[in-house]
């Protein structure tokens, strides 16, 4: 009973972080299964495994997106790494609102159940993650499936907003003595910016899907031209949330990568303040570019010109981050342990994803590329190889601190190489498919596209083998087998202590700090003084 009480009613940031990780892993496996089903259907032209049920194909696409975004990346990045390490990194005893933290987590399992049950009601919700009306309207999806999906989004949104409030309060008010804002570790900064993005964007999504709910059930016409509404209004509202959302997914990853590159290059991050302001700029600009998802809906030409220019400007702070990571590695004595491999892979692949993003930012080109596989390739390069690689990198970097045991290095490196090969083989051919005009969200295609699709599907099977390696690593590390106990500082940062988590035992005590640590000087400040 005590164990049940410990995990059900926990107010400890580490326990809640662990719950988020377990939840994210379960949702991630489910989302991966859906993606493999999608790739099996697309492996050859014609109907393969779904027997011509094209609505079911769209339900799979929708579920895959929701699971990966709202139930895997966000819980693991913000809920998992955020809860586990933000309090430790700032020298705080716990989060500001521990019980709010608990309810933030426990809103997610019911939300997941609602999403999964929506697939079982009538024909499921085959709207794509954007849930555009009129397809999501009562005439096109007459059952309760879309309503259940909307309620699922509401719950997960409430969870995220409560979590954001908690992080903002914690970071502003609970820093240890001497831990000024300009001394905050970059991961903490990234979580802070992310929390503000969530707080400002999620209420807009909530408004949009609530209006959709009343359109479906109470005969309002917010998005129905017959009653003076406009479906384009929904798109504006959705993307005003949806674009900051993609930065919410990647920003904590930026923070994690900064820590890893610094640790394994044996030097402080190049241009710390520049990194901080770059993240803040990305956060602000993220709210000013939403309509680049809507270049094909008939926006005015000067509107399109503005959104093209604004979107390209986002590349500037992103470029500052990329070059600062490279400058951090420049001249460092680099150790290519598994976390560093994932970090370097992240930088390389995220840059490719960013380049295709610059291509899509051109409103003229986007007319041709919108809703083709080029877009799918673009956002999977920044998510499937950006956010997910950052998750893996963070896992290998901090796993000793979490479990108190070292991971098997060779298996970790095998996991990296299989996954790296698999995801590139899956998503690189999609650029060619998109340039040839293959449309997204369609379960069949002309024979001309068969070659690249076969290759892409083969790549996704390889990725699954890589992810199985990962769970082998987790199993070995978490069991008390041969792997040795983890030192306080497994990456030998004693000579170069950069952040507080390497000064506490592994795993940290239930209450991390007996007394709050006082910060005298950071490594970066020391460097500058020299």
UniProtKB/Swiss-Prot annotation:
Required cofactor names: heme; Cu cation
Chief subcellular location: mitochondrion
Sites where the protein binds Ca(2+): 41, 46, 443
Membrane topology reported for the UniProt record: Multi-pass membrane protein
Annotated Cu cation binding sites: 243, 292-293
Residues that bind O2: 247
Crosslink (1'-histidyl-3'-tyrosine (His-Tyr)) position: 243-247
Alphabetical list of InterPro entries matching this protein: Cyt_c_oxase-like_su1_dom, Cyt_c_oxase-like_su1_sf, Cyt_C_Oxase_1, Cyt_c_Oxase_su1_BS, Cyt_c_oxase_su1_dom, Cyt_c_oxidase_su1_bac
Superkingdom, taxonomy of origin: Eukaryota
Catalytic activity: 4 Fe(II)-[cytochrome c] + O2 + 8 H(+)(in) = 4 Fe(III)-[cytochrome c] + 2 H2O + 4 H(+)(out)
Transmembrane segments: 18-38, 66-86, 103-123, 148-168, 186-206, 237-257, 269-289, 312-332, 340-360, 379-399, 414-434, 447-467
Cofactor note: Binds 2 heme A groups non-covalently per subunit. Binds a copper B center.
This protein's pathway: Energy metabolism; oxidative phosphorylation
The protein's role, per its UniProt record: Component of the cytochrome c oxidase, the last enzyme in the mitochondrial electron transport chain which drives oxidative phosphorylation. The respiratory chain contains 3 multisubunit complexes succinate dehydrogenase (complex II, CII), ubiquinol-cytochrome c oxidoreductase (cytochrome b-c1 complex, complex III, CIII) and cytochrome c oxidase (complex IV, CIV), that cooperate to transfer electrons derived from NADH and succinate to molecular oxygen, creating an electrochemical gradient over the inner membrane that drives transmembrane transport and the ATP synthase.
Protein family according to the UniProt entry: Belongs to the heme-copper respiratory oxidase family.
Protein name in the entry: Cytochrome c oxidase subunit 1
Gene coding for it: COX1
């Amino acid at each position: 009973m005590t164990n049940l009480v410990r995990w059900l009613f926990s107010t400890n940031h580490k326990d809640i972080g662990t719950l988020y990780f377990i939840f994210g892993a379960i949702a991630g496996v489910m989302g991966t299964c859906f993606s493999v089903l999608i790739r099996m259907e697309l492996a050859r032209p014609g109907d393969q495994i779904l027997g011509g049920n094209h609505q079911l194909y769209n339900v799979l696409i929708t579920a895959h997106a929701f699971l990966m975004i709202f139930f895997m990346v966000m819980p693991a990045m913000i809920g998992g790494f955020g809860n586990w390490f933000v309090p430790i990194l700032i020298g705080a005893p716990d989060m500001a609102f521990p019980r709010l933290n608990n309810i933030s987590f426990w809103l997610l399992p019911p939300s997941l159940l609602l999403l999964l049950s929506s697939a079982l009601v009538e024909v499921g919700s085959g709207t794509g993650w954007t849930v555009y009306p009129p397809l999501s309207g009562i005439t096109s999806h007459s059952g309760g499936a879309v309503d259940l999906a909307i309620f699922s989004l509401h719950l997960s949104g409430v969870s995220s907003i409560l979590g954001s409030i908690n992080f903002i309060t914690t970071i502003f008010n609970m820093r240890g003595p001497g831990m000024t804002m300009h001394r905050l570790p970059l991961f903490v900064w990234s979580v802070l910016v992310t929390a503000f993005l969530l707080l400002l964007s999620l209420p807009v999504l909530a408004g949009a899907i609530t209006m959709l709910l009343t359109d479906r059930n109470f005969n309002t016409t917010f998005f129905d031209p017959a009653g003076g509404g406009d479906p384009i209004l929904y798109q504006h509202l959705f993307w005003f949330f949806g674009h900051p959302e993609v930065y919410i997914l990647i920003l904590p990853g930026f923070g994690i990568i900064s820590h890893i590159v610094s640790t394994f290059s044996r030097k402080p991050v190049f241009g710390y303040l520049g990194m901080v302001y770059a993240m803040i700029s990305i956060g602000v600009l993220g709210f000013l570019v939403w309509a680049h998802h809507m270049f094909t809906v008939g926006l005015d030409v000067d509107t399109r010109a503005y959104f093209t220019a604004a979107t390209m400007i986002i590349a500037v702070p992103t470029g500052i981050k990329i070059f600062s990571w490279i400058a951090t590695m420049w001249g460092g004595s680099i150790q290519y342990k598994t976390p560093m491999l994932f970090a370097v892979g992240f930088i390389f692949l995220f840059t490719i994803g960013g380049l295709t993003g610059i291509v899509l930012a051109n409103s003229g080109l986007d007319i041709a590329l919108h809703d083709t596989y080029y877009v799918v390739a673009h956002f999977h390069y920044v998510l499937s190889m950006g956010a997910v690689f950052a998750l893996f990198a963070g896992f290998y970097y901090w796993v000793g601190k979490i479990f108190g045991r070292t991971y098997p290095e060779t298996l970790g490196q095998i996991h990296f190489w299989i996954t790296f090969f698999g995801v590139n083989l899956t998503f690189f051919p999609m650029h060619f498919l998109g340039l040839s005009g293959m449309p997204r969200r369609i379960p069949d295609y002309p024979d001309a596209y068969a070659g690249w699709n076969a290759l892409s599907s083969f790549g996704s099977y390889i990725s699954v083998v890589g992810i199985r390696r990962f769970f082998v690593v987790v199993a070995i590390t978490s069991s008390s087998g041969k792997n040795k106990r983890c030192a306080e500082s497994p990456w030998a940062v004693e000579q170069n202590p950069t952040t507080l988590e390497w000064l506490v035992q592994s795993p940290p005590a239930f209450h991390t700090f007996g007394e709050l640590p006082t910060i005298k000087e950071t490594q970066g400040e020391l460097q500058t003084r020299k």
